[in-house]
From Swiss-Prot:
Bias (Basic and acidic residues) ranges: 136-151
A GO biological process held by the record: intermediate filament cytoskeleton organization
Name of the protein this chain belongs to: Envoplakin-like protein
Pfam family membership, one: Spectrin_1st_PEPL
Keywords, alphabetical: Coiled coil
Region (Disordered): 18-41, 118-166
Biased segments, Polar residues type: 26-41
Membership in a protein family: Belongs to the plakin or cytolinker family.
Organism from which the protein derives: Homo sapiens
PANTHER family the UniProt entry points to: ENVOPLAKIN
Cysteines engaged in disulfide bonds, as pairs: none
């Protein structure tokens, strides 16, 4: 346990240093340089903390004389990691949707209505939300209005296709059931999803979304594949994390404060991601309409 605790301490100190450096970069309007390393350190710390909590629980059951003192030390480490997770979100999440693009302003109201009730109403996937509404039918109806919507054009040249699907969590880690004495699983799950969503949005924003994109048909295929095969499972993971968090809050777990903070951060990041997906859908439709005007005999599909 001592070796793991020492590594967590090192991760905390390294994370603190990187956060301070990027905070200074942000104040000076410079690029943030340490997001990936900071996320990796926090992820490692949370995995180690999970094992430490299990070990100290075993020591307590065996009535080890230092179990209580060790548990206090681990709880202090956990509080520090949780605080750094909150600082990570506050520092890096603002990079996801740059205000200068106006994405949130143009689309926030419509997408916000989809997620305000607690992420229970999927935008796509054709299954019922609140009241049994067919969201797939709604999405098709919205498609008829796309040519009249203003184009949102995330800038930058990069890979043209939709991001690769995020890998599913491995056993025992990310989306674990929330039971008394096991807050780390839910917190780790939220942190993992926050990191994954931020990475997805970063990659989307780096794609070529100009009206003259090289391969709109290929981009459309990748995007439709994501909607049909990946979006629903990702939404289910987010919903499961929300259920786990609610369960622990209802059980009045001592870590209710950090749990609620992580839940709110995840809810906001998921809404941002849906907003950006709507931007993709809108811009793809505009590019396809533009191609049909230029070449009436061709089809983007």
């Amino acid at each position: 346990m001592q070796a793991s605790a020492d590594q967590v301490e090192r991760d905390i100190l390294e994370t603190q240093k990187r956060l301070q450096q990027d905070r200074l970069n942000s104040e000076q309007s410079q690029a943030l340089q340490h997001q990936q390393e900071t996320g990796s350190s926090l992820k490692e710390a949370e995995v180690l903390l999970k094992d430490l909590f299990l070990d100290v629980d075993k020591a307590r059951r065996l009535k080890h004389p230092q179990a209580e003192e060790t548990e206090k030390d681990i709880e202090q480490l956990h509080e520090r990691v949780t605080q750094e997770c909150a600082e990570y979100c506050a520092l890096y999440e603002k990079m996801v949707l740059p205000p200068r693009r106006g994405i949130q302003g143009r689309l926030g109201t419509r997408a916000g209505a989809e997620t305000e009730a607690g992420l229970r109403r999927p935008v796509w996937a054709g299954h019922g939300g609140a009241g049994g509404t067919d969201r797939g039918a709604q999405h098709r109806a919205e498609g008829d209005q796309r040519p009249r919507r203003a184009a949102a054009e995330p800038g930058g040249a990069g890979c043209r296709h939709h991001p690769e699907p995020i890998p599913r969590p491995t056993e025992g880690g990310v989306v674990a059931r929330a039971e008394p004495g096991q807050p780390v699983h839910a917190l780790q799950g939220c942190t993992w999803q926050l990191s994954a969503l931020a990475e997805q949005q970063r990659r989307i924003l780096q794609q070529d979304w100009s009206d003259l994109m090289a391969d709109p048909a290929g981009v459309r295929r990748e995007y439709e594949h994501f909607k049909q095969h990946e979006l629903l499972s990702q939404e289910q993971s987010v919903n499961q994390l929300e259920e786990d968090g609610k369960r622990m809050v209802e059980l009045r777990h001592p870590a209710v404060g950090p749990i609620q903070a992580h839940q709110e951060a995840l809810k906001m990041e998921w809404q941002n991601f849906l907003n950006l997906c709507i931007c993709q859908e809108t811009q793809l439709q505009h590019v396809e309409d533009y191609s049909r005007i230029l070449c009436p005999s061709s089809s983007p599909h």
